[in-house]
Amino acid sequence: MSSSPEAETMECGISSSKVHDSKTNTTYGIIHNSINGTDTTLFDTFPDSTDNAEVTGDVDDVKTESSPESQSEDLSPFGNDGNESPETVTDIDAVSAVRMQYNIVSSLSPGSEGYIYVCTKRGDNTKRKVIVKAVTGGKTLGSEIDILKKMSHRSIIRLVHAYRWKSTVCMVMPKYKCDLFTYIDIMGPLPLNQIITIERGLLGALAYIHEKGIIHRDVKTENIFLDKPENVVLGDFGAACKLDEHTDKPKCYGWSGTLETNSPELLALDPYCTKTDIWSAGLVLFEMSVKNITFFGKQVNGSGSQLRSIIRCLQVHPLEFPQNNSTNLCKHFKQYAIQLRHPYAIPQIIRKSGMTMDLEYAIAKMLTFDQEFRPSAQDILMLPLFTKEPADALYTITAAHM
């Protein structure tokens, strides 16, 4: 293969580069490990993949230890396949539970809710890799399992099986090539057609779960998985919650998610609704469009600090705050409002990013500070950005790409 590196970043002995094969017109992302001298190909041209489609099975109640079945859902897209001993990073009970039905290929970093493994099904001659999430010690995946059992959408991670062994509950999920965070890091900023395709899939997933009375509460690039831009799914429903009485009226559902990507109302511990996911999806759209720009600063020292950073970076006008002055946003943060632009005008941090007008308009609408005026996922999907296919978008050059 004749190739030439296009970009490279270094950190702790690990570097990444993007190379292009002129003979096959193929772009690859490669991880280089200078410590052990290994290279790992992250991406090819994303050929049609059937990894997700071929992981089959019915979704029932959580199986007991005597059942040969297990359920599936994707949580972690990309790991160091086979370079780590499972026992070095995990609990022996989790390993035992997983090995009842799966061969462990490698272990991924434990998450806040459990241990995560790359596995193959025992007796499966295809050796197709899946992700198994195991929770031990009395913790439960019941809410996440219950939510995913009711989901059926091409852009939502599919729960195939779940099973219990003693006190350990396991969820089994298709293994995708990468998460969106990794994809952007290697390939970004992305061409406009890919941005639109991925965000359209994300918004479709959000419109679907919101219609079913579910708030995800942790929408971020690390929780979006893909084999190719046309095959993207929203995963990790561990922070998701159900709407009370199936109404989208803002209510107090408690704090959850990630400080860097949470909406203003959630950060302020005000009542919130499905619109909190739209804010987070707006940050995803911005991150795909403009690589290596940190929206609200790198240091997050709590929700108050994050809110002040949001107000400063977006130059939030006093008239953009909620009309209800009894909200925590108004009582504690309106004093930091800035009158440097007209109310609801596109913030300079977006305007100066060199993106198309349709794209900056969509991001600005999704990052509306007051949730009452923030559009729904279905509203955003009706914008021209998503209803019209970009003309030759692969070759659209903006200031952000220069």
Swiss-Prot record:
Q: Which SMART domains match?
A: S_TKc
Query: What are the protein's UniProt keywords?
Result: ATP-binding, Host cytoplasm, Host nucleus, Host-virus interaction, Kinase, Modulation of host cell apoptosis by virus, Modulation of host chromatin by virus, Nucleotide-binding, Serine/threonine-protein kinase, Transferase
Concerning PROSITE patterns, the annotation shows: PROTEIN_KINASE_DOM, PROTEIN_KINASE_ST
Primary location class:
host cell
What's a Pfam family this protein contains? Pkinase
* Gene Ontology BP annotations: symbiont-mediated perturbation of host apoptosis; symbiont-mediated perturbation of host chromatin organization
Which residue intervals define the domain Protein kinase in the entry?
102-386
Give its E.C. classification number: 2.7.11.1
The entry's comment on post-translational modification says:
Phosphorylated by UL13 homolog; this phosphorylation regulates subsequent phosphorylation of UL31 and UL34 homologs by US3. Autophosphorylated.
As for subcellular location, the record says: Host cytoplasm; Host nucleus
The positions flagged as active site in the entry are D218 (proton acceptor)
> Could you tell me what this protein does?
Multifunctional serine/threonine kinase that plays a role in several processes including egress of virus particles from the nucleus, modulation of the actin cytoskeleton and inhibition of apoptosis. Phosphorylates UL31 and UL34 homologs, two critical regulators of capsid budding from nucleus to endoplasmic reticulum, thereby facilitating virion egress. Modulates and redistributes host components of the nuclear envelope, including LMNA, emerin/EMD and the nuclear matrix protein MATR3. Phosphorylates envelope glycoprotein B (gB), probably to direct it to the cell surface.
| UniProt-recorded name of the protein | Protein kinase US3 homolog
Organism from which the protein derives:
Gallid herpesvirus 2 (strain Chicken/Md5/ATCC VR-987) (GaHV-2)
